[in-house]
Amino acid sequence: DGSQRGTTWQATPGLFAYRRSIAKEVLGTDDPTEVQSHLSDWDKFNEVAAQASAKGYKMLSGFDDAYRTFSNNVDAPWVDGTTVKVDPNIMKWVDQTKEYTDKGYNNKSSLWDSQWAADQGPSGKVFGFFYSTWGINFTLLGNSLETPVAEGGKEEVGNGIYGDYAVCEGPQPYYWGGTWICAAAGTDNTDIIRDVMQKLTCDEAIMKQITLDTQDYTNNEKAMEEIANSDYASDF
């Protein structure tokens, strides 16, 4: 009906996070620009999957790793009146998943299960993972460590495969996730809630600091451009 129901501080562009060491063995390079040239469409991606398999690696961990990349590129909604419509791009994902499973290009895991997490760690032999920006610091980093932070490990090169990941765009643009802030209906703190929501999602300085503090990607273009053009970086 045109009324705003929530707001968010995040932008959640998708990317492909790959193991530098594996890319170098399979493709002869770990440079993000060069790796992207090998993965810039699905035909090329599938070719690299075959190359990775020949070297003893899986291209993806599980059945649903690539799902969002396909599902974010459909042409129409799932439901039309009382009819459920399966977009051709979804069927491309089904076909690819069957091929990868039959040929051993994936490890038959599912998102968030223990095998999927282990495949991102020191013993993993998976070329890469489709992730959004939040997934790098909130999930992939922790899974990469040999000794978890909770057990005294440090987030630093030398602990597991910390530092062995790089990212590129992958075969198709997509997004994954986004956390939204909503006010409770009937609240008696309207002014305070409005101020909190506006500050967290509209204040350039605050949004820039969120990224600097947590590595979360915020939806303020100017703030993100300033960080991109600075010397800010992550050892991970």
Where are these regions (language model features)?
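Short aromatic-enriched loop/helix-cap "lid" or pocket-rim segments at secondary-structure transitions
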Residues: 67-76, 141-142, 222-224
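Mature extracytoplasmic/periplasmic domains
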Residues: 174-175, 179-236
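Helix-loop-helix "hinge/cap" segment bordering the ligand-binding cleft or interdomain interface
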Residues: 2-66, 78-111, 185-191
